[in-house]
Amino acid sequence: MDPEPEIEVALPPSARVVREESDRFFATHGRAKLFGARAVELVFIDGMHRFEFALRDFSNAEAWSAPSGTIVLHDCVPLVPASAAPERRTRFWVGDTWKAAFAIAKHRPDLRIRTILTPPSGLVVIRKLDPSSTLLRERFDAIVKELAGAEYPFEPGAWPPELHCVAADAEGLREALG
């Protein structure tokens, strides 16, 4: 789903692009209506470069996912701290989506989180999902308030331990998907 998708290649017949913002999509569509009895196995979240959106997208996507599924968050390991601000100040910008990864790690220790240090901004791989969990939705306002003014606290190479960073190679990928 994307309100303004920029797709430059032909998609297979089974692919479906929904021209809609994610909040509206999850509020107006039911998983069963779109997928029948099947749960979602893979979700890639590359949203609005704002942690509130990424956190809400994760929570909504997890509710649609299979427990064995995988959710991947993009733009959570900025190259430089200046690119991690909520408002764009640099040419290369990831926004404050990194906060969503920290919030998920802190509030959902039941999840398996591994971060692949892929250039230019990392991929957070989240497994062992619990589609019945409502914890992030229940704590959403408090989490947003807690992290609203937070600055990215790490320099390149000093990766956050709570995100369990792995190399962007075959071994790291096996670890992330393990």
How would you name each of these model-derived features?
Residues 1-31, 77-80, 85:
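SAM cofactor-binding core of SAM-dependent methyltransferases
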Residues 5-8, 31-34, 60-61, 114:
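Short, flexible, glycine/charge-rich loop motifs used to bind or transfer phosphoryl groups or to couple energy/partner
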Residues 9-10, 17, 34-35, 63, ...:
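Structural motif
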Residues 11-15, 39, 109-111:
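A short helix-to-beta-strand connector/capping loop
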Residues 18, 44, 72:
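Conserved Rossmann-like nucleotide-binding pocket used by diverse enzymes
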Residues 29-43:
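A short acidic, Gly/Pro-enriched loop at the edge of an enzyme's catalytic core
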Residues 46-49:
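Switch II (G3) loop of P-loop NTPases
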Residues 52-178:
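C-terminal substrate-binding/active-site "lid" region of AdoMet-derived donor-dependent transferases
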